[in-house]
Amino acid sequence: MPIWFKKVAEPYGWMGNMAPYPIQYAGKTWRTSEALFQSLRYADPAIIEQIREQKSPMGAKLVAKSSVNIVHRVIDAMSPQYVLNMEMCVLLKFQQHPDIAKLLKATDPNLIYEDATNRNKVNDLFWGAQRDTNNPNEPIKGQNTMGEILMRVRAII
């Protein structure tokens, strides 16, 4: 049976990048994998630090989005490097938190989907998938890149 995750407070919410699992990277602590991922889009140390210092993952995401017009991003959205960066962030999260690594391993062999139902932005459908309203366990639209990353990480850890 497929596993769908969406919000941190819901079942399997620990899979998402907004979940509060700090990550050590480059000698610094990042509050979430989302903050680290967003910072990797930039080369400017001031922007990177501003993203890292945000108290919430949504704050980190908003700073990253607002910085697009200020400085040049080094990573384009939805590029191969963008996906590799996400995979690294997700792998670090699970390597550094054995409690959730064990939970992720326990999902095998189920397919994992980031639930993008009711979201229609290109970015949402890149990372996730929408459910079929007639058969809620089946995806109907979306690349589900995040789910694919989680399943690859599950095989590694």
What are these regions (language model features)?
Residues M1-I157:
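Charged, low-complexity intrinsically disordered segments
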